[in-house]
Amino acid sequence: MQRLRRGLFLLLGVGLGILAITGLAAFYVDLAWFAELHALPVLWTRVIARWGLGLGAFLFALAVTGSNICSCWRGATLAGAWAIATGLSVFFAGSLSNHWFTLLLWLNQGPVGESDPIFNRDLGFFLFSLPFWETLQHWCFNLVLLTLIAVVLIYLVELGLSEQRLTLALSLYAQRHLLILGGSLFLIRAWGHWLERYELLYSTRGVVFGAGFADVHATLPATTLMSGVAGLTAVGFWALARQGIRLNLPFLKSWCPSWASSLLAPAILWGAYLGFGLLTTQLYPQLVQTFLVTPNELELERPYIEDNIRFTRAGFGLADVEVQPFPEGGALTWEILQQNQSTLSNVRLWDADPLLATYRQLQEIRPYYQFPYVNVDRYRIGGELRQVMHAARELDFAQVPPAAQTWVNRRFFYTHGYGLTLSPVNVVTPEGLPDFFLSDIPPRVSPRYPEVASVLRVEQPALYYGELTTTDVFVGAEARELDYPAAERYVYSSYRGSGGVPIPHLWQRFLYAWHFGDLRILLSRELSSATRFLYRRQIRERIRRVMPFLLYDRDPYLVIQGGKLYWFFDAYTTSSRYPYSEHLPGFPFNYIRNSVKAVMDAYNGSIDWYIADPRDPLIQAYARIYPTLFKPLEAMPEPLRQHIRYPQDLFRLQAQQFATYHMTDPRLFYNREDQWQIPGQFRNRRRIPMQPQYLILTLPRDPQGVANHTPEFVLLSPYAPVNKQNMVAWIAARCDGENYGKLLVYEFSKQRLIYGPEQVEARVNQDPLISEQISLWNQHGSRVNLGTLLVIPIETSLLYVQPLYIEAEQGRLPQLTRVIAAYEDRVVMEPTLGQALEALFLPRGSR
């Protein structure tokens, strides 16, 4: 027996030792990684807040559970009772400590400056305070409820389940004990009812999201009343605990056991509470909704519809949208086109998918290099703004030949991608391929475009951090890294950056080997005192590790500046707690701001965080929580700031929401008389919504007639009426300089028919010359793909442009073969955009 006991203690010691080393290794790996990013305050804030909240919750839960269990469990040792209480307290501490960031937001909140229309409370209460108080109330309720259940079980187990023993179990002491706990539950429930009043601002009962007539005039007073009823019920339980609760009524003795009569009085109180609650908070509001509101819905719900419109527009950043009539004027002419060459020279003829396929065929160079995505940006070249598309040439170790996928190659040799490929959006070679500004390995500027050399020079092309970079590598070691493959040899390099964690000591290697489950880290002779360990290099994982509370755009993009490469991220603050703001289907939030721009060095992995929207109350709270992390946007170097763009993900949400919430008149909104939608396009016989497009264009003149002569980078999406195909408006987000973030909507006259994208596509498909030519191509072993139809505003008119790609059925090299252009009721297809415009706007004899 003694030997068995020693064995058990040994196993317990070994298990605790393994847990301790695992925890220590994980903490050190995090500590070193955050130190590398100069973000240690972020880690320490997280650790202190989580453990501090957990410790406070543990002590409070231990006091509640321990005092109750010890007072009722007479047959147990004091140590045993406290052991059970400790186990329960650890559970409750862990559950509450997960809400540490809710606590920090509550402690660091600030006023929003806008109040809700029902309670007249600053919206900061709903964004910061209400989530914290609700979390605390739920936690306290569950703590007391579980304590009550534990106490009941202890009384029952201690004295058995016979009627005689149940009577003993429910002695006066036990009755008082249980009633005190029951009263405490009802007191916490009264607190919960009081908080539920504020939840009415997120009601879905009425015609719109948020509190409606029935909520305000029936549910709100009923919930307030229920808070008082729950409080009185708690007082009733405590009064019974003080006075005694057994009901000695003569008619009860014939059918009610003596132990059950002890439960009758609290059962009556509990039943009365439930019945009153069902009548007041469920039945009464439903009767008001059915018999009063529904027959008079618009009249009674009008003020609440107005609130929903106002707060939804505010929640999605649509309150300041500038709506203008699209200027009317003469027809689009050749002369007007010549005056808008900045727009025409940036018409995007390359779609992302065919361009990516072409990049992969022509520029990946080696199987282990991959282009994951194509991105859009703009550069000022030769004094003009030029829109470009590019893709990072990343290293995907999964594509290395299987025989070469050794541990040494994974950790030391294949360490980084190399450079990028970049081409203008509007230039096509005679072979129908993109004409590169920047290409090859090492990155080379095309001699045909010497003016881009100073802007697009890449002096540090190595990509140690990227979207496909999932391996952890050692750099600065004895082994040489592959820099890039040359014609007949490999060019080697050694990392000279500041990224990664130095691991000069054996104990550090031991902790990393333990954490990553890789003993070879400890045993490898390739490591030296100069070695640095680069881990968590996948850029999305890397940035989320630092700030998991932000929502990130799906499209990070690469920027060339000063010979170096940087990853740009758009990050959003979101909340589901904005009163009256309507959710979009499938999205959990009803408030969103693009409040943060993050920039990551692709060579060193360092991250800089910039506040792009200082008016956002959420990012201001974040900045108070992490005062050393965020910088003002003005601190971003000006050359980098020129590459900020309005994010597509946010724009999609705003455009979708504005399709309904451009209607600000409650009657118009209620009847959905002017509902819009994003037009569709057909791809593979399936209709999908059009995606917003980045364009460089000159915006139309303003309502005062002042002309705009400056080309700018904008994000644009058209609108059509619901169940119709004509175009009624378009929305644009400005991306440049002091106009960044401004949203413009241009509405067309309702007396004027404007062809929508779907109508133009239908006319393209019905054109006999175009459809005949497409059929001929499809019959000769080729596959024809129509690209995205672009809607291009030019002064007082709209021009439609659609590229056409051909690729062999056996190959994957799309070629841009034709360009389709349309204006009003004319459609043409020509080899180039210039020829298509000539065919549209020049008489035959003058071409």
Curated annotation (Swiss-Prot):
The keyword Isomerase does not apply. Keywords: Cell membrane, Membrane, Transmembrane, Transmembrane helix. Belongs to the UPF0182 family. GO terms for cellular component: extracellular region; plasma membrane. It comes from Synechococcus sp. (strain JA-2-3B'a(2-13)). It is a multi-pass membrane protein. HAMAP family: UPF0182. It is found in: Cell membrane. It comes from the Bacteria. The keyword Nucleotide-binding does not apply. It holds the Pfam family UPF0182. This is UPF0182 protein CYB_0372. The chain crosses the membrane at residues 7-27, 51-71, 76-96, 141-161, 168-188, 220-240, 259-279. The lineage of its organism: Bacteria, Bacillati, Cyanobacteriota, Cyanophyceae, Synechococcales.
